[in-house]
Amino acid sequence: MLPNKKFFSPGWYFQKARLRFAKALLDLGIPLKFTSQIDDFQIQFVTTSLLEYSLRAQKSYTRERVTMGWLRNFVGAGDVVYDIGANVGAYSLYAGKKLKSSTGRVYAFEPAFFNFSALCKNIEVNWLNDIVLPFPVAFTAVSGPDKLFLSSTISGSALHAVGKKESEGKSFAPRFTQGVLSS
């Protein structure tokens, strides 16, 4: 007998099973390729963490509606886009796909070493290396060498801090400290 329809959703169970399977593969060190269909574009991600797989690759385009609205409505042929804090590149990749047949460019800035590596891989698998140019640089009030305090070293993570062990007004114990050039 099937559970009460009110509480039974086969789609939910399949989604959970797919997520558990993805986690098992990622835990074994097997990177997963995920393709997001957004507007007229297929955007590929090579993911190495569950956070990157479930949040950045699958949900970036629906979570930040204001960012997507801006990219959809204001980025056009020949434009230059600066993605500061690009993470693994979801918005850089979308802008790059929009600008692919024009002279436009995307400059993607991501200082965290693991996110920068993922950003570069995602640019490569989407064939956007002539349009999206990544830089491992942080933007702060003071230029020069500094410390980047990483709240996590998991690909796709965020809320890191330059100069102070504080993010969004809260102190944190860094998982790793990385040297960074600030601009």
Each predicted region: which residue ranges?
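S-adenosyl-L-methionine
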Residues: 1-183
